[in-house]
């Protein structure tokens, strides 16, 4: 049994204010769970050719800011935001990375959007669950807030394969594989 086969998971977390553009943790999660056949929606590697957020585009946006070209910046970021929120729309669950030391404007909008749709939003807080913002505990079942990637991975494996799971009034599964 693999409840998560062909489910779409959105990898949500800061990109523009982190050194690696948010790539490393996303690649780690994808490789650690490759056997679950999850279809990952990754904003660092979008399955679409618009709203791309690579190093080149990030540097271009920073140049626009520096030059005061806010019209161009707004036009480009509205497209990025549109594509990213669309990925939240079509995903089945979110994996969210929160670092309390990094301002993550889009991350909180995407998390809020996914939560309003009652999607499972698995939040990993780098500083640990005990340091997670209090607001998160009012938004999400605390069982979806984690301190480490190992906990997130173990939880997803539990959801995918164990006979008895708590759906937390969020998980909904369609059997695409016939297993």
PLM-predicted stretches and their roles:
Residues 1-179:
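Conserved catalytic or regulatory cores that recognize and/or transform ribose-phosphate-containing ligands
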């Amino acid at each position: 049994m693999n409840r998560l086969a062909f489910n779409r998971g959105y990898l949500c977390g800061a990109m523009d204010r982190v050194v690696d553009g948010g790539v490393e943790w996303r690649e780690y999660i994808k490789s650690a769970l490759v056997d679950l056949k999850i279809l990952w929606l990754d904003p660092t590697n979008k399955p679409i050719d618009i709203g791309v957020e690579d190093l080149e585009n990030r540097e271009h946006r920073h140049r626009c800011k520096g030059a005061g070209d806010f019209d161009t910046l707004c036009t480009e970021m509205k497209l990025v935001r549109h594509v990213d929120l669309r990925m939240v729309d079509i995903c089945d669950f979110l994996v969210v990375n929160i670092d309390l030391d990094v301002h993550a404007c889009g991350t909180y909008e995407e998390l809020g959007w996914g939560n309003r749709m009652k999607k499972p939003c698995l939040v990993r807080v780098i500083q640990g669950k005990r340091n997670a913002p209090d607001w998160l505990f009012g938004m999400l079942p605390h069982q979806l807030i984690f301190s480490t990637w190992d906990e997130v991975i173990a939880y997803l494996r539990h959801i995918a394969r164990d006979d008895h799971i708590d759906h937390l009034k969020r998980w909904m599964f369609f059997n695409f594989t016939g297993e």
